[in-house]
């Protein structure tokens, strides 16, 4: 009796604990590698969007805490209630990013290991009510951000119901969303906090408060009669600072979530993602380049001679040989763990795809509101619809951008499998010299007002063409692994170089000499006058 009671008090023995917490106890070992590889390669690793929406799916899960906070009208005098933290599976091993987005602590709580419950972070103090003008604008902004059930979407449901048969948006609607996304990104770049949800000053002030409270009891007792008069002033200053920081964070959070949703819409073609769940529930992907995670688009027939299969479906050269599949004895546990991880990631992709397909198309009411804002700030220029000429082909199926077969052959043959050079040629073919010359590039930099400057106002390049070229370069280099894919900074540099050369009176493609960038690959002994003379007589092409 006594040994049994002692064993019950001590809990499970060491072998049992190891069996329960072993890293490979949850993973099911495969009888052979063939079914595992079939499961791994039969499913796409990227989100593939079908042109037609499938049958109605079950309703999506409730929105994360940040979405509910964004939907609460800020103009109300009562502080918005803090939503309870949603329950997550214990074995996931990932801390929910929604808690990190809505928490005001400077550092997020680390993710607990599998099998251990994660201690929920204390709820932050409710944000103070804003002033009347800011509250009205923010509440209207929240009504645009929110795409859930509510009075703000009454017209949306009716508009979406009338367009239920056709999910494709018109060119004007796409132009409105593209222009609004570009203006939101410009506002974000000009904010002092840089679009971050937390600020360093805020965290330092919180740490200083904690350090002040952490002093010993004797010191506080000695300083009590001295600091009593100062504490009231410091508390008022801290309250003012907290209010300012929370207002700043709310504005930045609204703009960032809305900009991310519009950018995701642009990347997903005809299926928009204007909801906050993608920015808050999956916040660990917020710092990743959105173009690198864009869904698969068809290239509209533009392929190079050595074309491999699409990303996520490896070619025959990357598949293992039959002899390797027969060797099941050397299949290590780490490989089994990786196979299980791949399958779990594919299941996550399928869940994301189902959520993406369940999002409604933006209704006409939202589009009219965005168009009104753009027209009020004189930022919407209706672009003439580009008519495809005979022999021209479309770069991407979702964008009205066309080039001829001769131009495509010239660009591919002269690019030397470099994505930057290909982008330079495409800019030369898609934009005219005047469009580049009288534009402010991508509109990302803060322009200083120069007095006495004459001529038309400089506006950003057509966002539809810019987005099309960006995505086409990414998709082309992804589909052709032998091509060199440029980074986001290098793509922006190519656009700015093209605008700079157009302003200097040169042809658009004259900087396509022998190097990858502006004067790269040229003889460094040659002066700029010689380079300019070469570009004038056309020898620089």
Swiss-Prot record:
Q: Which classification does the entry list for the species?
A: Eukaryota, Metazoa, Chordata, Craniata, Vertebrata
Write down the superkingdom of origin: Eukaryota
Positions with biased composition (Acidic residues)? 320-330
| Pfam families, per the entry | BEN (PF10523)
Q: Does the keyword Transit peptide apply?
A: no
Q: Identify the residues that the record assigns to the BEN domain, covering every copy.
A: 398-506
Q: What InterPro entries has UniProt attached to this entry?
A: BEN_domain, BEND4
All disulfide bonds of the chain are none
GO MF annotation terms: DNA binding
User: Locations of Pro residues compositional bias?
Assistant: 53-66, 111-131
Query: What is the name listed in the Swiss-Prot or TrEMBL entry for this protein?
Result: BEN domain-containing protein 4
């Amino acid at each position: 009796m006594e040994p049994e009671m002692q064993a019950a008090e001590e809990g499970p023995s060491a072998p049992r604990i190891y069996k329960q917490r072993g890293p490979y106890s949850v993973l099911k070992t495969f009888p052979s590698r063939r079914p595992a590889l079939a499961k791994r390669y039969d499913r796409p690793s990227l989100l593939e969007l079908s042109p037609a929406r499938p049958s109605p799916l079950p309703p999506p899960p409730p929105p994360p805490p940040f979405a509910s906070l964004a939907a609460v009208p800020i103009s109300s005098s009562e502080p918005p209630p803090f939503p309870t933290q949603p329950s997550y599976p214990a074995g996931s091993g990932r801390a929910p990013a929604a808690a990190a987005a809505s928490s005001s602590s400077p550092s997020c709580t680390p993710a607990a290991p599998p099998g251990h419950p994660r201690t929920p972070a204390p709820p932050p103090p409710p944000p103070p009510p804003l002033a009347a003008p800011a509250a009205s604008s923010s509440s209207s902004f929240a009504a645009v951000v929110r795409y859930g059930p509510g009075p703000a979407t009454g017209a949306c449901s009716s508009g979406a119901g009338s367009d239920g048969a056709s999910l494709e948006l018109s060119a004007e609607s796409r132009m409105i969303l593209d222009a609004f996304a570009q203006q939101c990104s410009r506002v974000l770049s000009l904010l002092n906090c840089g679009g971050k949800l937390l600020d360093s000053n805020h965290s330092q002030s919180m740490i200083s408060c904690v350090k002040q409270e952490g002093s010993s009891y004797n010191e506080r007792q000695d300083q009590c009669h001295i600091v009593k008069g100062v504490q009231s002033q410091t508390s008022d200053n801290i309250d003012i600072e907290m209010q300012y920081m929370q207002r700043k964070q709310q504005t930045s959070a609204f703009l960032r979530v809305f900009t991310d949703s519009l950018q995701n819409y642009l990347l997903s073609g005809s299926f928009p993602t204007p909801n906050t769940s993608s920015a808050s529930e999956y916040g660990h992907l917020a710092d990743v380049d959105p173009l690198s995670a864009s869904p698969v688009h068809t290239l509209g027939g533009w392929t190079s001679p050595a074309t491999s299969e699409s990303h996520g479906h490896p070619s025959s050269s990357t598949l293992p040989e039959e002899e390797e599949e027969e060797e099941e004895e050397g299949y290590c546990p780490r490989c089994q763990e990786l196979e299980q991880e791949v399958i779990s990631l594919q299941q996550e992709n399928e869940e994301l795809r189902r959520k993406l397909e369940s999002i409604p198309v933006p209704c006409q009411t939202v589009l009219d509101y965005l168009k009104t804002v753009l027209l009020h700030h004189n930022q919407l220029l209706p672009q003439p619809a580009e008519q495809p000429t005979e022999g021209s082909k479309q770069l991407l199926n979702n964008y009205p951008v066309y080039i001829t077969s001769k131009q495509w052959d010239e660009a591919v043959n002269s690019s030397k499998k470099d994505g930057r050079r290909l982008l330079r040629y495409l800019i030369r073919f898609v934009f005219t010299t005047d469009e580049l010359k009288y534009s402010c590039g991508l509109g990302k930099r803060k322009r200083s007002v120069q007095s006495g400057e004459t001529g038309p106002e400089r506006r950003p390049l057509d966002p539809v063409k810019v987005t099309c070229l960006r995505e086409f370069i990414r998709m082309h280099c992804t589909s052709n692994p032998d091509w060199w894919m440029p980074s986001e900074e290098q793509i922006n540099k190519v656009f700015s170089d093209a605008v700079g050369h157009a302003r200097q009176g040169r042809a658009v493609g004259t900087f396509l000499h022998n190097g990858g960038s502006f004067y790269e690959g040229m003889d460094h002994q040659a002066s700029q006058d010689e380079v300019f003379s070469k570009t004038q007589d056309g020898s620089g092409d």
